[in-house]
């Protein structure tokens, strides 16, 4: 067992205001996920972030990026075969230097960077890459998970918690077969999640006791993790509820996309009436968590490009309004791409030309509404 002194008072030792009944210990950061290192296969991401993109974000008033990384992206190993446990610590420093450069570029534009292991040794919410072990079950996977966080914490040990945070693991869930995209998920047992989060946090704070650590909600980011409340770890929720709107016709979520009913907001969809009340209920535990002194941020949110645009905006306006009323920041999933403000590929948007990109001005205005 690790004492809660492990934390070093990271969330409350900064210049941020102390939590009160109506405040959130974390700043209300707003911004985007950048997917430059999201794929386990280097070179497969076409939409690389440039300094100009970062400048646009800052000019539009945003102050946050989340960097979801797949650990195989920055390893040296034989990619003609599945990865082996002995490969998992073979860091390719040419690639990690690129990641570091993107972090420092973002800092030059006043953007906080939250590093995230979207694919960690032994776990990812997405299939498509064969893991050699299981993070929730195998000690070797846990040790390698901590190795990676030790590496990143050492890289950024002199960077202030106001500029960088460490988001441990994207969307934890218990899935028996991690190589089946549509296998049933459930919550990770609380004690198991605590043990993993505590070990990684210890590795991160060994380099700087004031490092800001964030843990995604359990059950694919949806539910508060009471088992972590005493560890001085912030928690990250999601802005994807209900999935019938956010992931309408998303093939990686639903096997038979043609069976999905047309989304409405508000309105009756299948056997449910969808309205703001549903969101108020969904976010209530997260709001209460922030009122109890645990920092809360919405690390991912948005809508796939098959949802009718006006339905998306109507729903998202409610999501963002609830978050803002309780001082909870957010990061849209993507800056450019099917969830993004640029080049989203929607069939029902009157795009504005923005230096050769297609800008969804209505979405941008909604995101900027409370900046």
Model-derived features: where do they sit?
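An active-site-proximal structural segment forming one wall of the substrate-binding cleft
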Residues: 54-63, 84-119, 123, 127-167, ...
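Acidic/histidine-rich helix-loop elements
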Residues: 34-49, 78-91, 137, 244-278, ...
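N-terminal export signals
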Residues: 1-15
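Short, acidic/polar
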Residues: 43-58, 145, 279-286, 316
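Surface-exposed, active-site-proximal loop segments in enzymatic domains
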Residues: 41, 73-95, 121-140, 174-185, ...
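Aromatic-rich peripheral "rim/lid" segments of glycoside hydrolase catalytic domains that contact
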Residues: 308-371
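Active-site region of glycoside hydrolase catalytic domains
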Residues: 127, 135-274, 280-304, 325-331
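Catalytic domains of carbohydrate-active enzymes, especially glycoside hydrolases
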Residues: 49-72, 286-289, 326-329
């Amino acid at each position: 067992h690790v004492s809660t002194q492990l934390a070093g008072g990271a969330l409350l030792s900064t210049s941020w205001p102390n939590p009160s009944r109506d405040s959130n210990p974390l700043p209300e950061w707003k911004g985007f996920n950048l997917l430059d290192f999201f794929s386990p296969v280097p070179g497969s991401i076409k939409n690389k972030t440039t300094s100009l993109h970062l400048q646009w974000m800052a000019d539009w008033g945003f102050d946050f990026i989340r960097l979801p990384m797949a650990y195989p992206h920055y390893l040296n190993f034989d990619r003609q075969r599945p990865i082996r446990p002995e490969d998992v610590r073979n860091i390719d420093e040419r690639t990690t230097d690129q990641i570091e450069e993107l972090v420092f570029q973002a800092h030059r534009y006043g953007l906080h960077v939250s590093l995230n292991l979207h694919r960690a040794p032994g776990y990812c919410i997405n299939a498509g890459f064969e893991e050699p072990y299981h993070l929730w079950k195998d000690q070797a996977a846990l040790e390698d998970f901590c190795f990676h966080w030790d590496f990143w914490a050492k890289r950024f040990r002199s960077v202030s918690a106001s500029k960088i945070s460490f988001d441990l693991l994207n969307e934890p869930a218990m899935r028996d077969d991690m190589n089946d995209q549509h296998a049933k998920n459930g919550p990770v047992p609380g004690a198991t999640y605590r043990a993993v989060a505590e070990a990684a946090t210890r590795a991160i704070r060994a380099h700087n006791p004031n490092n800001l650590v964030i843990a995604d909600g359990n059950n694919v980011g949806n539910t508060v993790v009471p088992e972590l409340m005493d560890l001085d770890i912030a928690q990250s929720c999601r802005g994807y509820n209900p999935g019938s709107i956010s992931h309408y016709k998303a093939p990686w979520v639903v096997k038979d996309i043609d069976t999905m009913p047309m989304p409405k907001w508000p309105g009756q969809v299948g056997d449910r009436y969808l309205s703001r009340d549903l969101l108020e209920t969904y976010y209530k535990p997260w709001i209460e968590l922030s009122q109890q002194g645990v920092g809360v941020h919405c690390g991912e949110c948005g809508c796939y490009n098959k949802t009718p645009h006006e339905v998306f905006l109507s729903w998202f306006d409610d999501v963002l309004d609830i978050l803002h009323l309780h001082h909870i920041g957010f990061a849209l999933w993507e800056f450019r791409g099917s969830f993004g403000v640029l080049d989203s590929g929607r069939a029902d948007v009157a795009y504005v030309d923005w230096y050769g990109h297609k800008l969804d001005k209505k979405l941008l205005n909604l995101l900027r509404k409370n900046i």
